[in-house]
Swiss-Prot record:
SUPFAM superfamilies referenced in this protein's UniProt entry, alphabetically: S-adenosyl-L-methionine-dependent methyltransferases
Function as written in the Swiss-Prot or TrEMBL entry: Dual-specificity methyltransferase that catalyzes the formation of 5-methyluridine at position 54 (m5U54) in all tRNAs, and that of position 341 (m5U341) in tmRNA (transfer-mRNA).
Keyword Glycosyltransferase listed: no
Family of this protein: Belongs to the class I-like SAM-binding methyltransferase superfamily. RNA M5U methyltransferase family. TrmA subfamily.
Active site: C323, E357
GO biological process, one term: tRNA methylation
Catalytic activity: uridine(54) in tRNA + S-adenosyl-L-methionine = 5-methyluridine(54) in tRNA + S-adenosyl-L-homocysteine + H(+); uridine(341) in tmRNA + S-adenosyl-L-methionine = 5-methyluridine(341) in tmRNA + S-adenosyl-L-homocysteine + H(+)
PROSITE patterns named among the record's database cross-references: SAM_MT_RNA_M5U, TRMA_1, TRMA_2
Keywords: Methyltransferase, S-adenosyl-L-methionine, Transferase, tRNA processing
InterPro entries: MeTrfase_TrmA_AS (IPR030390), MeTrfase_TrmA_CS (IPR030391), SAM-dependent_MTases_sf (IPR029063), TrmA_MeTrfase (IPR011869), U5_MeTrfase_fam (IPR010280)
Protein name: tRNA/tmRNA (uracil-C(5))-methyltransferase
Record-linked HAMAP family: RNA_methyltr_TrmA (MF_01011)
GO CC list: cytosol
Organism: Shewanella loihica (strain ATCC BAA-1088 / PV-4)
Length: 365
C-alpha cells in the first residue's frame, strides 16, 4: 500500500499513465483503439483486509505502507466501499472493550457488496471456544441493527460461522439484475462498478455470436452467466470446489438453462478435448455435441500454459481477460500468428496501483 498515491485529484492522470503504458506495451501488434473503463475515484473496492494492533487498552486497524516503511493506523480507508468504511468504526468500537473478542485478534477481513451485504472475518492466534461463539453471536445481533452482516471466526484449523460464510451480490448489467453468491476466501472481482463494465463489454463484443461458448477458469460463473444470453450453450470449467458450488447456485438464481459447469483444471480439460486422457468428471458430458466457435479465458497471472495456448488457437474467436499484461503479451506473440486483435480494453480494477486489467477479442485471420 502507498498512502500518498491514493489521491482522487490525481486519479485521471494516473489512469492516463496506465493507458499510455498499455498501449506502448502492445505497440508491436496491430490493435484497434484502446477502450478505457475508469473506476470510481474512492470507495471502489468491495473487499479489504486489515491487521489489528494492540496497544494497551487501545485496539485499531492498520496497514503497512511500503513506501514509508511503516504501519499506518486506519480509521477509514479510501479505496474500500462506503459500506466497509461505515462498518469499520462500529466494529472496532464493539471489539475494543470486549476481552473475549479482542484477545489474540490479529486481522479483520471485510467482504461487501453493491447490494448492501457485508461479511466480517475475525482472525485469531488462539482456538475459539463456546464463550467466543456466544460473544460473536451477540456482536452480530448488535451490528444487525444497522447492517446486513454475517461474522466468521477463524483460527488454525478452525472456522466458526454466524450465520453465513457468503454474501449475495446483485449487479445491474445492461438493465438486468444478475445475482452472484460470493463465498469468503474465494475469488471475486474486487471492484464492483468496474466488474459491471467488464461484463457489459464482454456481452457487447459477443452479441452476434453463433454456436456455443467454452470458458476456462470460470470462477463462480461471473462471466459465463452474463454471456449465456449470447450463445446456444455454454460449457465452463473451474477447479476450485467453493467456486464451482457458487457457480451452480448462481446458475439457478439467474434461471440460466444453457450453462454447464465442470470441475476441472484448464490443463486437464485441454487433455480431455485432445482425447489424451479420460476423466470420471466428464462421464455423461458429450464434449463432441458442443459447437464452440468462441472460447473465453481469464487465466491467473501466469497466463496460459503452452498446451492450453495451442488449444485456444483452434477457435474462431478468443476472448481473453488478463490480470497481467506481461503474460498477455507473451501469449499474444503466439496467438497473433493465427488471430488478429479486434477489440482492446483497459479496466481499472485497482486505482492508485500499477496493476492493469485488460481484455482483448481475437478473431481468426
Amino acid at each position: 500500500m502507498n498512502v500518498d498515491a491514493m489521491d482522487p485529484q490525481q486519479y485521471d492522470a494516473q489512469l492516463d499513465v496506465k493507458r499510455q503504458k498499455l498501449a506502448q506495451l502492445f505497440v508491436d501488434f496491430e490493435t484497434p483503439e484502446l477502450e478505457v473503463f475508469a473506476s470510481q475515484k474512492a470507495h471502489y473496492r468491495m473487499r479489504a483486509e486489515f491487521r489489528v494492533w494492540h496497544e494497551g487498552e487501545d485496539l485499531y486497524y492498520y496497514m503497512f505502507d511500503k513506501a514509508q516503511n511503516q504501519k499506518i493506523r486506519c480509521e477509514q480507508f479510501l479505496p474500500a466501499s462506503q459500506l466497509i468504511n461505515d462498518m469499520m468504526p462500529e466494529l472496532m468500537a464493539a471489539l475494543r472493550p470486549n476481552p473475549v473478542l479482542r484477545h489474540k485478534l490479529f486481522q479483520v477481513d471485510f467482504l461487501s457488496t453493491l447490494s448492501g451485504e457485508i461479511l466480517v472475518s475475525l482472525l485469531y492466534h488462539k482456538q475459539l471456544d463456546a464463550q467466543w461463539q456466544e460473544e460473536a453471536q451477540a456482536l452480530k445481533e448488535a451490528l444487525s441493527s444497522k447492517f446486513k452482516v454475517d461474522i466468521i471466526g477463524r483460527a488454525r484449523k478452525q472456522k466458526l460461522v454466524m450465520d453465513r460464510d457468503f454474501v449475495i451480490e446483485s449487479l445491474p448489467v445492461n438493465g438486468k439484475q444478475l445475482t452472484y453468491k460470493q463465498v469468503e476466501n474465494s475469488f471475486t472481482q474486487p471492484n464492483g462498478e468496474v466488474a459491471i463494465k467488464m461484463l457489459e463489454w464482454a456481452i457487447d463484443i459477443t452479441r452476434d455470436s453463433s454456436g456455443d461458448l467454452l470458458e476456462l477458469y470460470c470462477g463462480n460463473g461471473n462471466f459465463s452467466i452474463a454471456l449465456a444470453q449470447n450463445f446456444n450453450r455454454v460449457l465452463a470449467t473451474e477447479l476450485a470446489k467453493p467456486s464451482v458450488d457458487s457457480a451452480q447456485y448462481n446458475i439457478e438464481a439467474n434461471q440460466i438453462d444453457n450453462l454447464q459447469i465442470i470441475r476441472m483444471s484448464a490443463e486437464d480439460f485441454t487433455d480431455a478435448l485432445a482425447k489424451k486422457r479420460s476423466f470420471r468428471r466428464l462421464e455423461g458430458v458429450d464434449l463432441d455435441s458442443y459447437d464452440c466457435n468462441t472460447i473465453f479465458v481469464d487465466p491467473p497471472r501466469a497466463g496460459l500454459d503452452d498446451n492450453t495456448l495451442s488449444m485456444v488457437q483452434g477457435y474462431e474467436r478468443i476472448l481473453y481477460i488478463s490480470c497481467n499484461p506481461n503474460t498477455l503479451l507473451d501469449n499474444l506473440k503466439v496467438l497473433d500468428k493465427t488471430h488478429k486483435i479486434t477489440r482492446f480494453a483497459l479496466f481499472d480494477q485497482f486505482p492508485y496501483t500499477d496493476h492493469m486489467e485488460s481484455g482483448v477479442l481475437l478473431e481468426r485471420r
